[in-house]
Amino acid sequence: MGSITVRYFCYGCLFTSATWTVLLFIYFNFSEVTQPLRNVPIKGSGPHGPFPKKFYPRFTRGPGRVLDPQFKANRIDRLMNNHIEDPDKGLSKSSSELGMIFNERDQELRDLGYQKHAFNMLISNRLGYHRDVPDTRNAECRRKSYPTDLPTASIVICFYNEAFSALLRTVHSVVDRTPAHLLHEIILVDDSSDFDDLKGELDEYIQRYLPAKVKVIRNMKREGLIRGRMIGAAHATGEVLVFLDSHCEVNVMWLQPLLAIILEDPHTVVCPVIDIISADTLAYSSSPVVRGGFNWGLHFKWDLVPVSELGGPDGATAPIRSPTMAGGLFAMNRQYFNDLGQYDSGMDIWGGENLEISFRIWMCGGKLFILPCSRVGHIFRKRRPYGSPEGQDTMTHNSLRLAHVWLDEYKEQYFSLRPDLKNKSFGNISERVELRKKLGCQSFKWYLDNIYPEMQIPGPNAKPQQPVLINRGPKRPRVLQRGRLYHLQTNKCLVAQGRSSQKGGLVLLKTCDYGDPTQVWIYNEDHELILNNLLCLDMSETRSSDPPRLMKCHGSGGSQQWTFGKNNRLYQVSVGQCLRVMDLMDQKGYVGMAICDGSSSQQWRLEG
């Protein structure tokens, strides 16, 4: 009898313990009341430690919908779980080794990022949704003040298959660096993206961690950037429309200069200076102040600023008249955007719309300026990671519409370069022709004479080139060290396989010859390794299995950016791997890249 009593007592204890365990699990996993705020790591990133406190997200509750528990368990918990495998390999957001590959999973994520997005998604994910960026404005801009009665802004961001981390970093940068009373709303237009994380997971994140003024509109089919922006603008209710790309980061005091000019003249369209975010390293760097132009192939180009634009009393902070805009980032009074005809809805997807709206602004009574005191960073990719839905050449289609509506007799300059397009169909332009008449627009000759006199017209009577600001070229980076790149284990030096001047040539290990100047490397403050003062050591960002080669120095970092780290390793920033000797026993001396492990095959020293 006693044994039976003890047995049931034990059963009771077990049942009670199990009940409390279940209750505590439910409470801590599903309660939404008074849970402590914590850093939100990025899904899919590699191992790294916690980021500094100043980078922690500032959470703001979105609209209070009842959350589905299963969704929370499967999506949001996975979003918060960074799958940290080795916290000792912690990396700060400013680390040059933020893109380091630790395992095959990191390598797959990095390679997938270049394939899907044409930039380093591994680094993007590790950066998180908040980071500090350098204030790249001229010092005079920091002393400027702006009116208190500025108009409110609707930020329109159209995206298609964007990287989740890049999109949210764009949104958070706007929320973090825009005064709340000026930010009327952020409208995200999903142009029928295919990626799952841009659907329910994005909605849930916005609901939980962003203000209610962040809204998502989803197109039922692919409309393209042009019509996507028109859809976003149709939903906007702020006084000013600000269009941004989906892989940007706005800088400090970015919005106030734009709004101040529009407050002064609602018929003025303004663009920020577009700073550079490297596609390979995501490093943020300043851009020079230039202005937009175009060529007779109807492609946008950047021009130096004419001397005539630089003599005003405001000096380096003065707005710069720009004949055209790049198109990705600009602000415009919402009513003026509608009155001026929005975009040409007959244009498809992307391409040419920036020139069309630029010509229309100037020819129909408006103004277009670039503002040096407004800065926005933009990831500049080397290619577009996606095409048109049907594979059509939208740039040609859109350029033809532009030429036939706005160029008048100067469209023959375009057709002289593209005679194959003279009889190509471009759709019905009657509405746009009628719009031009209704707005009472000037001729294209007026535009060339008054807005872009620097534009050359080929022919025997070509006008002389107008003077422009002298460009003295970029300053040469300072040399930090000069010597032979010595491999500690083999006692050999890294040299060119053939001539040191051969572009695309391989490098390998050979016996060091201290009398041979072609074995001498220069390491400079831009982290370039230059052999014989001729070519840079370069890696393919998209084919990390390829060996390093000697290529012309491009000065953009990324594929030519190397750092000497601990354990004498030579780390390639954009590839995220270290230089190694392929086989220590092989006399051929071939080198390649591998996951950094501090092994003897990866130990190098630059010796004078």
From Swiss-Prot:
Keywords per UniProt: Disulfide bond, Glycoprotein, Glycosyltransferase, Golgi apparatus, Lectin, Manganese, Membrane, Metal-binding, Notch signaling pathway, Phosphoprotein, Signal-anchor, Transferase, Transmembrane, Transmembrane helix
Disulfide feature: 141-373, 364-441, 493-512, 536-553, 578-596
Cofactor(s) of this protein: Mn(2+)
Lumenal topology ranges: 30-608
Family annotation (CDD domains): beta-trefoil_Ricin_GALNT11 (cd23440), pp-GalNAc-T (cd02510)
Region (Catalytic subdomain B): 319-381
Keyword Oxidoreductase: no
Catalysed reactions, as listed in the record: L-seryl-[protein] + UDP-N-acetyl-alpha-D-galactosamine = a 3-O-[N-acetyl-alpha-D-galactosaminyl]-L-seryl-[protein] + UDP + H(+); L-threonyl-[protein] + UDP-N-acetyl-alpha-D-galactosamine = a 3-O-[N-acetyl-alpha-D-galactosaminyl]-L-threonyl-[protein] + UDP + H(+)
Gene3D superfamilies given in the database record: 2.80.10.50, Spore Coat Polysaccharide Biosynthesis Protein SpsA, Chain A
Residues annotated as binding Mn(2+): 245, 247, 378
GO BP, one annotated term: cilium assembly
Residues of the Ricin B-type lectin domain: 476-607
EC supergroup of this enzyme: transferase
Membrane topology: Single-pass type II membrane protein
The keyword Membrane belongs to this UniProt entry's keyword annotation: yes
Sugar attachment sites: 423, 428
Residues annotated as transmembrane: 7-29
Region annotation Catalytic subdomain A: where it falls in the sequence: 150-261
Oligomer and partners: Interacts with NOTCH1.
Its biological purpose: Polypeptide N-acetylgalactosaminyltransferase that catalyzes the initiation of protein O-linked glycosylation and is involved in left/right asymmetry by mediating O-glycosylation of NOTCH1. O-glycosylation of NOTCH1 promotes activation of NOTCH1, modulating the balance between motile and immotile (sensory) cilia at the left-right organiser (LRO). Polypeptide N-acetylgalactosaminyltransferases catalyze the transfer of an N-acetyl-D-galactosamine residue to a serine or threonine residue on the protein receptor. Displays the same enzyme activity toward MUC1, MUC4, and EA2 than GALNT1.
Description of its domains: There are two conserved domains in the glycosyltransferase region: the N-terminal domain (domain A, also called GT1 motif), which is probably involved in manganese coordination and substrate binding and the C-terminal domain (domain B, also called Gal/GalNAc-T motif), which is probably involved in catalytic reaction and UDP-Gal binding. The ricin B-type lectin domain binds to GalNAc and contributes to the glycopeptide specificity.
Protein name, as recorded: Polypeptide N-acetylgalactosaminyltransferase 11
Organism: Mus musculus (Mouse)
